[in-house]
């Protein structure tokens, strides 16, 4: 890859004029382009690259709302997420604190971190404070916290930090910018302005505690509120001053974050450049625990396959994937919910290199599924398995030495016709309940061969057909942005 340009707007111009460029120096050109490494590289910024390596984590909404489980005074909450039940059901604070007494009665940080680890996840992101303002750590900023108000009386964030560190699981914090102990509860929209007293009297000291007392924090996930651009910059700066390697999400608002996040439960299957993360809950209607969710055994295989598909679709499209589970009020995870994530963890263990440590590729997404790469291998994730049907991938450079059903000794027939690779599926579906994986092995790292190439010289005009673009996670004034990549015949870098 040798040149990158940002193209903003809904469509690209018919031609791009790249001038002036310093005269590039080329080695002797081969007779045909050999392509570029198929793997989309990690960010060249160390902290971003380290975060991208995490790939897959557990999001966990846990607080006083978990004790309610979506019910108040014997009736099911009629509107809104259950973690916002205090506002939707107009629950008085004194009543709310009565429920807090029962919070985390059976909380076991070791068991939670083990579930995360055994599920193939690399980080745990938990709600340190949701919109209700109830702090889930031992804070000196308010008595409205789990240590002071629950019979549990301990700091679950400290316990999670200790136990997850033992297993190599990174810790991340969700932090709501709004605080219903100081603002009128408004669950209908993201309209709460942030006054200076809240900024300096609550948000700053609470962030200081969270980023000082619990070890390295992989990401700080802000949410809600209507801060000014200056306030957004200050919040991001506070985080970076305390922990320079902590990634800040885009919901700090006003383009002050380090990475983009979409809407709740928004999972894209389209490739996007730039650091980004998708979040999805096991039950899209609730992020905190909802006791009424369908946990019938007949629904389990559907949830497992949905999770696998969302995981593959996100990481193969260049993003991180955080999957949410809401523990019960006592701090335990429902057996159905933990069973879904651990089953997918077993699938990942059967295919240890297909996701973990693998990278998305430059290949345009084929109609039959998704692709990842690691080392000298490509990994195909076909959506369907049908004996005799083929998986065709154009623009493949390099020499294929073997194709097999990943995790087995079953080989598959294949042909290479120029830059077109065709694999024929055969035998029974190796993963009838989840997603099959095909391993394609090369004699060196696989390459992507663009269908159009151009030799770049000063003042060269390059048509839209001669670059390949990938949508950026960033948007500018509501328009989609694109990262455009150009490759010259010799695959040597052009430097400005």
Residue ranges, per PLM feature:
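Bacterial N-terminal signal peptides that target proteins for export
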Residues: 1-10
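Intrinsically disordered, low-complexity segments enriched in polar/charged small residues
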Residues: 9-10, 21, 60
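Repetitive helical segments and hydrophobic/amphipathic motifs
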Residues: 13-14
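C-terminal segment of classical bacterial N-terminal signal peptides
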Residues: 17-25
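Mature catalytic domains of secreted/periplasmic carbohydrate-active enzymes
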Residues: 28-493
